[in-house]
Structures are given as C-alpha cells and as structure tokens.
C-alpha cells in the first residue's frame, strides 16, 4: 500500500507516541503507524458499519503478525455468534482462542446486576477483565460495546465517573484498548462522554448512493499524532477490513526513460525511442469499433513475449470471449494465460462500487506482481 506523506521536523524519538500497528491494509498508513499504544481508542459508527470487525481484525492481526495476545470482551454477542459471523471471512478466531492467545469473554449483563445505586461501580468487571488479561499476558483489549455495558445507568454523574474510571483502569493495565460505540445524531456515542476522554476516535460510515453501498472511515481525533484527515473508502471482504488511502498517496515514484513496445512496430516508430514509456499511463480513446481492444491486446501480447507478466482487467468481456475475439487477429492470449504470464479478470462494473474495484486491483497487483496492466474499459467503471 502507499505511504502517508512525511512531516517536517518530527518530534525526538523519545517523545514520539508509541503505536500498536493494526495490520489492516491501508489503516496503518492513514494513522501513521496504528492505534496509540497503551491508550484507549473509540470506534464509532452506525449499525453494520464494521465496528466489531475492526476490533477483531486488530486482535487477530495482533496475534498473527505482532505476537501480541488479546482479550475480546463482548456485552452483546456470544462466542458462538461471533464465530458464525466470521465464518464467511478468512479469520479463524476459534483456533486462536483454542491456542490461548486470544481470550473471549461474553459478559451477560442482567438487569438485576446493573441497577441504579449510589454505590454502583465496575469492580466486578475489572476483576474479570484483569483475570482475562493476566491469564494470557494480553497486550490488546477490545470491549464491544460501551452502550451495552452502561445500559442500566441513567444517572449522568455516576455514568461519567464510571466511564472515566474504566478508561483510567485500562491505561493503568498498559494495554492498547479498543472500545466500540454506536454513533448518535449529535455525538459519537449514545452518552457523548467517551469521545472527550478517548485518545483516538475512528468513525465508520456506510452510505448508499445510486443504489451502491460505500463504506468510509475517518480519523476524528488522535492525541499526540499526525494522521490523515480525510474520509477514506474501505471495504469488507473475505480477508476482513481493508482501507484505501487514496488521498494519502504520495507522488514519489521514480521516473524512467525506458521504452516498451506497443506490440505494433509501425506504431513504435511514432514514439521517440520506440514505444510507450515504462511506468507511464497510456489512454487509448476512440468510438466503438476503432480498435481500442486490439491495441490493448497487441501491448498485452508484446509484454508476454518479453517474458513479463501482465494483468488484464476486463469490464466488458469474459476471459473466454476476449481470447476468442483476439485470436481472429492473430493474438494467442490463451497461450500466455496457460503459461502463467497473463491473468485475465472479468467483472461487471455495476456489481460493486468504485472502491471495491480499486481494492480488488490493489490485491491483484500484490498477487500477480505484473509488469504491465491493461484496463478495458475504464469508462464503464
């Protein structure tokens, strides 16, 4: 993924805020390293926005990528319900729980247990949470969700005191904590108190425009750290949650004078040095039937003949139809596909939003590692 732009005059290393990387594609770029280490982050959003999944991604990646055990404490869904929710994703939470590197705690908040009393406190919760943390040496904690935890308290004074005490207790345990909360009309949580004492606030949004769902993520607040300030698209697929830091992309890639053949010798002669410039973007424009696909096929064939892998994204034809049509003008694309030099991916553009198509492209680039990419046709995306 891309790197966030560097800031001038960074703070001395000893003074910089330590961070816990999430391992989520793109997210660590816009937060410049992840979530604040040893502090509390509030994840806010509406129903179905991805709050719980972001927390689970944070825990699972923490174990797999950074060897940091974690605790997931749910005040809503049971352990089996969470496992079922993750069944369609490549996130094997159950295996990590069995290995005792993630501790799952389902806290059932009976109304009789949470009553409005002058001496109400969270000592019972602290004891249970401390036992879970200490039993596996957890470095990361997720509480899902804070509305359910404090649902039985209506006294504002008690509520404010207990929320502050919870956040202070988590910091004292020196764990990196994530707390989820439902976004309300004029605040990031139902109570509107957590946002003031959270060190970091992440807002998730899921909106529908022109019958296409689009997910957005934004860093609202991050004490002691620079961060991307824009809204960034993100998607949820079988790999979990992935962020596309489009507006954080830096223009720092190197230039080159190297040329590559168009696949048509007479066309190469029209370019100074012969052919397209390596690393450049070439737009082939024209009305229907003017040969746009043929020019793209010529370039694809030439790239494969040089032994360079090529990725062909088709939004109009299936792989079989493309191969058949191009064989009529002597381009044997099937040969290159069988040799593993050419990967053709066809998708109907109306099935997904632009963000999903872009993320798919990111992942295909990482998988195929092509030297050449052909997109046919960008106008229908």
Residue positions per predicted region:
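Conserved inter-motif catalytic segment of the P-loop NTP-binding fold
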Residues: 66-151, 308-381
């Amino acid at each position: 993924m891309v790197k966030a732009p560097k800031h001038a005059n960074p703070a001395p290393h000893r003074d910089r805020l330590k961070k816990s990387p999430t391992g989520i594609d793109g997210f660590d770029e816009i937060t410049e390293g992840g979530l604040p280490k040893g502090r509390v982050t509030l994840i806010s959003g509406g129903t179905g926005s991805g709050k719980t999944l972001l927390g689970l991604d944070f825990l699972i990646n923490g174990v797999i990528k950074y060897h940091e055990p974690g605790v997931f404490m749910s005040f809503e869904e049971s352990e089996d319900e969470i496992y079922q929710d993750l069944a369609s994703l490549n996130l094997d939470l159950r295996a990590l729980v069995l290995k005792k590197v993630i501790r799952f705690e389902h806290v059932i908040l009976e109304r009789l247990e949470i009553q409005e009393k002058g001496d109400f406190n969270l000592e019972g919760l602290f004891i249970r949470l401390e036992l879970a943390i200490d039993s596996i040496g957890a470095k990361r904690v997720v509480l899902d969700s804070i509305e359910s935890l404090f649902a039985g308290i209506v006294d504002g004074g008690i509520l404010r005191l207990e929320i502050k005490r919870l956040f202070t207790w988590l910091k004292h345990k020196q764990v990196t904590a994530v707390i989820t909360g439902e976004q309300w009309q004029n605040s990031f949580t139902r109570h509107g108190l957590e946002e003031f004492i959270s060190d970091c606030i992440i807002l998730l949004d899921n909106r529908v425009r022109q019958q296409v769902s689009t997910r957005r993520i934004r860093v609202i607040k991050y004490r002691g750290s620079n961060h991307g300030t824009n809204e960034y698209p993100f998607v949820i697929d079988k790999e979990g949650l992935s962020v596309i830091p489009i507006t954080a992309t830096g223009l720092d890639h190197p230039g080159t004078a190297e040329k590559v053949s168009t696949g048509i010798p007479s066309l190469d002669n029209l370019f100074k040095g012969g052919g397209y410039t390596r690393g450049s973007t070439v737009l082939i424009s024209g009305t229907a039937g003017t040969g746009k696909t043929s020019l793209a096929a010529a370039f694809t064939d030439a790239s494969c003949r040089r032994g360079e892998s090529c990725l062909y994204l088709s939004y109009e034809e299936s792989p079989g139809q493309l191969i058949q049509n191009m064989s009529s003008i002597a381009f044997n694309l099937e040969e290159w596909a069988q040799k593993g030099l050419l990967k053709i991916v066809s998708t109907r553009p109306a099935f997904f939003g632009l963000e999903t198509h872009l993320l798919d492209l990111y992942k295909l680039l990482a998988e195929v590692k092509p030297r050449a990419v052909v997109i046919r046709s960008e106008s229908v995306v």
